[in-house]
Each structure stands twice: as structure tokens, then as C-alpha cells.
A protein has these predicted regions:
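Amphipathic alpha-helical segments
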Residues: 1-18
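Intrinsically disordered, low-complexity regions enriched in serine/threonine
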Residues: 16-33, 38-214
Length: 214
């Protein structure tokens, strides 16, 4: 990481013991699997809609396993904070891909994932700020009903999930009708969803909506 000093391992409790000294952690390499978690926690993206001034930062997680799921996955996201037990607060999925270990395709997938990581490490934070500003000013519709209709049609969301996301955005965001406000509503909904497949579907919808303004 010498070439990318802004990116680093997040701090976690030493040996996983709650309350212990916090040390850089988030990298694991075994005989048949690996895990890498990096954050750019020193370059705030300046979210203009954040009334808490908590900051918004970039991160990514790369996983590979030859057993179990037997897949290579890469997830790029925005976040507010990472606590000592590596819970990611304000998680906002931006992009990701998953490739199963089938034939020789995994070699190409590795190359693709490393290219994505390299691009992310080198990317100017100003590009992400531009996307946020654009998403904050672009509206899905002029009314609640119009936003819900657009969300259901464009994001493959159920009417129930679309309405719940809007309610959360209305409660916490400056403009729940904006792309950015509604994305934050989806993120909060994902955090309240108990099942992993449900969280994935909501996160995927949020990612799809955010990338539509890129």
C-alpha cells in the first residue's frame, strides 16, 4: 500500500477481544481462502446532505474461497464509520461482482477484480463528490407517490419495501425524493432487514439507483 498511503486497514480490537487495544486488521490469507478489507478513512467526500457531519468515506472488501461458496467477490462501498468489531455504519453499496470457480474463468475474474481495485485506489475523490452532488439534486419524482412508482418500476422493489425506504428517507434525509435521499432510505432499510438475501436485494437496488446518475 506504499503507493496508496490514503488507503489502510481499519482498526479492530486485537484478537477480537472487545475493549482491547485497537490495531490495524481486516486482512486474512489462508491455504484456500482470503479476505481483504481496506478503507480510505482520511478523505471525506463532503456529503452536502449530511446534517450530522459524520463524514462519508470509501471502502472495499475482496473475498476469495476455494471451498464453501467457492467464489471470488468484490464489493465497493461508501460508509460513515467502522467500529472496533468491524461493523460498518452508514454502509452504502456502490458496485460489486461475484464469480464462481468454474473452469478457467476465475483467472479472468481475478484480473478484473484487481483492475477494479487499482482504479478505486487511484480514483480522485472529487469524482465521487460529483456523483453525490448530482444524486442530491436529481429527483425520482415530485411527490411520494411518483417516487414509489419510479422505485418499483426501475429497481424491481416490492411496493412494501419502496414505501418503507421512503419513510426512512423522509425521517432522516433532507430530500427523500432525491436520488441520494432515497438511496439513504434504502440503506437504512437494508440495515433493518433480518435476512441476508433480503438485505442483498435492497442493497442491489440502492447500488443500481446510485450508479444510474454516474
Amino acid at each position: 500500500m506504499v503507493q496508496h498511503p490514503a488507503w489502510h486497514l481499519p482498526l479492530g480490537y486485537k484478537d477480537g477481544a472487545f475493549g482491547a487495544e485497537r490495531v490495524p486488521s481486516g486482512a486474512y490469507l489462508g491455504d484456500r481462502d482470503m479476505f481483504l478489507f481496506l478503507v480510505d478513512g482520511n478523505r471525506d467526500l463532503d456529503d452536502p446532505t449530511d446534517r450530522s457531519n459524520a463524514g462519508l468515506f470509501r471502502g472495499f472488501i475482496l473475498r476469495n474461497s476455494d471451498v464453501g461458496a467457492a467464489a471470488l467477490t468484490l464489493d465497493v462501498f461508501l460508509f460513515r464509520a467502522v467500529c472496533g468489531n468491524h461493523i460498518i455504519w452508514g454502509f452504502q453499496h456502490v458496485a460489486g461482482f461475484r464469480r464462481r470457480h468454474v473452469g478457467a474463468s476465475i483467472q479472468e475474474a481475478w484480473t478484473t477484480s484487481l483492475d477494479h481495485i487499482r482504479a478505486g485506489l487511484d480514483a480522485d475523490p472529487a469524482l465521487d463528490r460529483t456523483v453525490i452532488l448530482r444524486a442530491a439534486t436529481q429527483e425520482l419524482g415530485p411527490t411520494r407517490e411518483a417516487v414509489l412508482e419510479a422505485a418499483v418500476q426501475r429497481l424491481d422493489l416490492s411496493q412494501k419495501h419502496a414505501a418503507e425506504a421512503y419513510t426512512l428517507a423522509e425521517q432522516f434525509e433532507m430530500n427523500p425524493r432525491s436520488v441520494w435521499g432515497y438511496v439513504q432510505g434504502l440503506t437504512r432499510l437494508s440495515q433493518h432487514t433480518p435476512w441476508q438475501d433480503g438485505r442483498f436485494a435492497v442493497d442491489r437496488a440502492a447500488s443500481r439507483l446510485l450508479t444510474s446518475v454516474c
